Every structure is written in structure tokens, then in C-alpha cells.
Amino acid sequence: MKRVGIGIAGYGYIGNIHALAFQSLPYYYTDLPFLPEIRGICTSRPDTAIKAQEETGVPFVTSSIDELCERKDIEIIVVALPNVLHLEVVEKAARAGKAVYCDKPLAMSMEEAIKMKQMVDETTLIFGMSFQNRFVAAIWRAKQFIDEGLVGEIYRVRGAYLHSGYGDPSRPMSWRLRKEIAGGGALADLGSHLADLVHYLVGNTTVIAARGRTFITERPSQVHSPNLEKVLVDDWSQVDFELDNRAPGIIEVSRFSTGSCDEMRLEIEGSRGTLRFNSTQPNYLEVYDNRKLSGPLGGERGFQLIETTQQYPYPNRIPGKSAVSWIRSHIACAHDFLQKFGGWASIGASIDDGIQVQKFLETSYRLMGYE
């Protein structure tokens, strides 16, 4: 089997996840067009590059993006860096003729996103984004139901993405809390996933109103530091939007949701039925079909749990009956991108999808006053 070389730009939390996803592909799929190999990792400092090599055994590590992109044995660059660096890496990868698999959100602004789009169009660069929630099996099934007409005309969309890890005021500043590096807070971090899912499942959105709050306005600059820095990004946000048919929608995101771990909820209501998904119950999709008969004691009507587990449509080695894990959607997303790289059909997020999400974020932040 032909092998394809992958270089990972950034080896923090999400870089590690992408490495695991690509390396896991041969253990999940029997139809791989290429065998992926992690051949290089770029980190911010030489010492962390050496640590990454010790942990992974990757043959090449560097702290230079140029060195990573210039290697002839690397064909795909995975962008897993803070948002402020996305444009630079995409530019260098495009000039070097590499394919790009970019983490979310696409960029810091619409201006940057459009520059990336121009580069992709001019160089015919193969470009994909890791909006992996498209590849949760239950979400995939929801897309099928919507396309088949089970929901009917969309009446309402409601989503929430809830974390609780930022409620401790002693938690120090990090790049995700620095506006000049992240571009935004909870909405950019968590809301980008929901914005993409809504766009993917039910179409375009127009932002109508948005609110945001920063609950802890100052944090230690680093662990145990007496120096405080101002926090200029949102801890909580709520965005009201409309679909093309004027159906209302709302998205709420929070990194201060006490008691939540990593909970994403999505509800889509229509003239014929309703779909509900909660990431804390990832093996199931709730489905209500209004066409089922009512009657004494309820008839046949009611929400039904569709058992999606790991029943992915591609040939894979893992039994579909097995409970699904969080990393599984990342693995499926990486598989889809590898298919795209090989010239096959893809349902993964494109740069145009990334631009739609960027527009959603930028409009929302302008209405919040977080520009």
C-alpha cells in the first residue's frame, strides 16, 4: 500500500489527538487509499520538540514551520496551533504544495479566511477542516433523516455546548483566553462546532442578535503569579439566528457551566418530526416521527432511541455494536480527509464551510461588542 507522510504543526492537546487519529486509521478501516505515517512534528520550542520525539518516536522534529513544510517526505500538514498562526502555516504549506488539514476555527477574522480561500483556489490545494462532530455516528444519522424528509420543514433549531473548566478564578491565562491569539472565547472555541453542525445539517444561517459575558475579568498571568491580566474574551455567549426559511435558532455556549464536562446538545424540530442529540449519550439519536399514529394510551407516537453506536457506513474492523468513544469521530474525520486526499468523495468540512463559520463568529462578536 502506498504511504503518505503527515507533518503535525503543533503538539499540544489537539495536536496529540490528531496524531492519535491518523495513527489509528489502519486499526479501524480496511479501505484506506494510503497508509498514513506521522513523519514530522513542529512545536513552539526546541525542548518541546525533543519531548514530542521521545514520546512518539517520530523521525523528525523541529521548532520551525518552514522546515516542516519544506520536507519532501511530508505531503499533508495538520494545523493544530493557536488560531493566530493558522494563516501563516496555511500560506507556507500552500507554497510548498502540501495538502492541509486545519483545526477550527479557520482563522482570526473574515479577512484572514478570505486570504486562505484565495490561496486554496489559486494553488488547487487540498484543504479540509477537523469539524469532527459531523462524524459522530448519531449526527451522521440525523443528516440522513433530514435529507430523507423525516423532519419536514424546519421550525426551530437549538444548540448548546457546555464546559465547566474555566470557573476557577485561580486558573491562569492561556492562549485560549488571550484575544490576540485565540480571536475569541467560548463562542470561537465551542460555538464554532455548533455553527458548523447547523450549517451542515440544515443550511445557511443569518445572525440576528448575540450576547456575551466575561465572568472572570482578570486572571493570573501564569501559575501562582501575583500578576493579573485582563480577560477580553467571552466566557459565555448566546446567539440568535435564522435559517433561510426564517426558522429561528439559538446557540448557547459556556466554559462556566458548573457540573458539565463536555456536553453538546442539539435539537432540530420540524413539521414532521424532531431530532435530539446529547454528546453525553453518544450512542443514541432521539427521533420523533409525527406521522406515527396516536391512539389510546399513546398509540405509536413518542421519541425513539436510534442505536447508532459505531455503526459507521465504511468497512471497518470495530464491531458496530460496540459503544462509541469520543476519539472515534476524530478518527472518522481523519479517514474522510484521507479519502479526499486520494480524490474520493468527502463529506468533511471544506474551506467554504470554514468561511461560513467564520462569518457566524465575526458577526456575533460584532453584535456582542467583543470586536
PLM regions: where:
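Short active-site oxyanion
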Residues: 36-40, 58, 75-77, 184-185
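Predominantly a Rossmann-like dinucleotide-binding segment in NAD(P)-dependent oxidoreductases
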Residues: 126, 133-231, 285
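Beta-strand-loop-alpha-helix segment that lines the small-molecule cofactor/substrate pocket
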Residues: 76, 82-134, 149
